[in-house]
Amino acid sequence: MKKEMNRRNFLKLSSAGIASALLGSTGLLSWSPRAEAETISKTFYITEGFITQPDGVDVYFRGFSPDTNSLTVPGAQMIAQEGDTMRITIVNTLGTSHSFKIDDVVDSGRIYGGQTKTIEFKVNNAGSYMYYDGRNAPYNRLVGLHGGLAVMPNGRDDELYDGSPRFVQQHFWLFNDIDPVWHNAIRNNRTPSTRYSPRYFTINGLSGRPPGAPGNGDPSIDAMHDHRSALHGHVGDRTLVRILNAGKCQQSVHTHANHMEWLTENGQVRDDVWLKDCIYLEGNMGQVDAIFPFETPPDAYPAASTGVYPMHLHTEMSQTAGGGLYMFGAMTDIFFE
C-alpha cells in the first residue's frame, strides 16, 4: 500500500535527509559510451514536505523523489547519449496537478493529483538540460520540482559536443534561491502576492557550512563537502561543470585557483571559448557549461599543486542564509589532490 501524502502527513527532512535520498551517487556523472542507443527508464514520485534550512527554519518543498517516503530536491541527476529513448514514469502523490517538462524536448501535459503517467521521448542533441514542472510556472519549479539531464555525444565520454574541448570528469551545479513566504503560499495553493525576497540559496539542494559551524565537513548537509558539488581532482583532471539555475536570481559563478573555459550559454555553443573567473548565469532557468581545467594555480607562490579553493557566487546575498548568516549560502570547494 502506498503511503498517501497530505496536509497532515508531511515529510520533514533536514539537509541530511535530502542527501540520503541520493545514496549511492558518487557525485561524478559516470559515463561509458555505447555503440547503440538504449531505452533508459526512470520513475519519479512527486512528493512534498519540509526541509530545515541552515538557521533552523523549516521551509515547504515539492520534489521529484525516488519513492513515496522521500523528498528529493533537486531530483536525481540523469545521463544518456544522443539517440537514447527516455521512458519516464511520474507518480503524482499530491492533490494538485503537475507535469514533467524539458524545453524543446518533451512536455508530459497535465498529470492530475493521484495520477500516474508514463512518457517516452528521444534525446537527439548532446547538451545539458533542466527537467522541471512546467505547470503553474514558475512556482512549482521554484519549490523544488526540477533536476538535471546530461546528454552525451555518440561514442564520446570526454566531449560536451562534437569537437568541444575535452574533459576527464563531469558534475552538475544546480542553483536555486528560496523565498519561504512564496513557498508557504504555494503550499496553500495560493499565488504569491508579495515581492520576491529569497532568504536561502542552494547548490544541488544544499547550503554551505563554514568552519566552526555545526555540520561543517559533513557531506550530507555541507555543500562545501557534498560529493555532487565539490570538485576533486589532480592537476590535469579537467572537469566539465553543467551549471543550471532553477531560481529567479541572476548569478555570477566565480572559481578560485583557475579560470574556467566557458563553452555554452543557454544551450548555444559560444563562438569563442573564453577563460573567465566569473561566468554570468541568467535567472529563471539560465544555463552554462564550463570546464574547470585543474591546472597548477598560476598565481600561487611558491607553486602548489595541492590545496583547497572556493567556488562562490558574486551576488553577496547568495552567500548568506536567513538574511545575514554569511557563508551559509550557495558555495562549494575545489580540492586539488
Predicted features and spans:
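N-terminal, post-signal-peptide metal-ligating segments of extracellular/periplasmic oxidoreductases
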Residues: 3-108, 188-239, 324-337
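Short, well-ordered beta-strand elements within core beta-sheets of diverse protein domains
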Residues: 119-121, 228-230, 242, 289-291, ...
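Amphipathic repeat-derived elements
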Residues: 120, 129, 138-159, 166, ...
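A contiguous, surface-exposed recognition patch within enzymatic or periplasmic domains that forms
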Residues: 165-258, 301-312
